[in-house]
UniProtKB/Swiss-Prot annotation:
Miscellaneous note of the record: The reaction proceeds via a thioester-linked acyl-enzyme intermediate.
Protein name: Octanoyl-[GcvH]:protein N-octanoyltransferase
Function: Catalyzes the amidotransfer (transamidation) of the octanoyl moiety from octanoyl-GcvH to the lipoyl domain of the E2 subunit of lipoate-dependent enzymes.
Feature type site, description Lowers pKa of active site Cys: K157
Gene3D superfamilies membership: Bira Bifunctional Protein, Domain 2 (3.30.930.10)
Keywords: Acyltransferase, Transferase
Coiled coil: none
Domain BPL/LPL catalytic, residue spans: 42-246
Keyword Oxidoreductase listed: no
Homology family: Belongs to the octanoyltransferase LipL family.
Entry superkingdom: Bacteria
Length: 275
């Protein structure tokens, strides 16, 4: 399956994979909003941004409505996890040094990029990055943040996709569990939900996490995979679609927008999470 969204003449490449433990996940969502605005207004070529965060659980808006969320958060914090609420769709996911995040940022054209086209472009890219595997698309029941565009190998989920649209730009974001234990990551989220629900029935159905439904690429391919090696595969896949890659950083105008969006993320988190 080819996706015309991947056949861009030029991609700006912004690599945030090695900024270390002080790199706050709230910053990533602010970066993507700032870049969406640039791409959406025609001031920038499409962007591919790569990012890694240490020991962070990223919650969805729906997670903030859990009846005993303060108990779930306390558990995660005791285990050394930071927590934030993102501004795109979905539910709780785990980020750590073994998880590569990729954002593809496109202009939302006059015809409009429908939601499925954005998801399909990312799924196609990941499949091209992993030619030795049969990557399947479809909800993996029992995984965390389940959705119809879960990516799996042999029925075990290793990646999930979300989208964010703002000011004429579309950010399609994926997390990829590259190495480490997928089941262990899922175990943290299962415990978070169990403590945050404490047996109470809710209108919204939160996922029942079955840890063995999730795995990393290292586990699934039976070979050690690294974030840096997967980044190289991503570059090669984009070039195979005929694109030129242009290493880049934010412009002064983008930094200005970034600081505005970062403050919004800080304010949002202060409002939505119990202190």
């Amino acid at each position: 399956m080819m996706s015309e969204l991947l056949q861009q003449q030029t991609w700006r490449v912004i690599d945030h994979t090695s900024l270390g433990p002080s790199f706050d996940a709230k910053q990533s969502f602010a970066f993507d909003d700032a870049l969406c605005e640039s791409v959406g207004s025609g001031q920038s070529q499409p962007v591919v941004r790569l990012w890694v965060h240490h020991q962070t659980v990223v919650l969805g808006i729906q997670d903030t409505k859990l009846p005993y969320i303060e108990k779930g958060l306390a558990y995660l914090h005791e285990q050394g996890w930071r927590t934030i609420v993102r501004n795109s769709g979905g539910l709780a996911v785990v980020l750590d040094e073994g998880v590569l995040n990729v954002s593809l940022i496109f202009p939302d054209t006059k015809k409009g990029i429908d939601i499925d086209r954005g998801y399909e472009a990312m799924a196609t890219l990941i499949a091209h990055m992993l030619p030795e595997a049969h990557v399947q698309t479809g909800e993996v029941v029992g995984s965390y943040c389940p959705g119809s565009f879960d990516l799996s190998i042999n029925g075990k989920k290793f990646a999930g996709i979300s989208q964010r649209r703002i000011r004429g730009g579309v950010a399609v974001q994926v997390y990829i569990c590259v190495n480490g234990s997928g089941a262990e990551r899922a175990g943290w989220i299962r415990e978070f939900y169990e403590r945050s629900l404490a047996g109470e029935q809710t209108k919204f159905t939160y996922p029942t996490i079955v840890p063995h439904t999730m795995a990393s690429l290292s586990e699934l391919l039976s070979k050690e995979m690294t974030v840096s090696a997967l980044v190289i595969r991503l570059y090669e896949a984009l070039q195979a679609f005929g694109s030129r890659l242009e290493p880049s950083s934010l412009t002064p105008a983008e930094w200005e927008r970034y600081y505005m969006y970062f403050q919004r993320m800080i304010d949002r988190n202060e409002t939505m999470l119990p202190t």
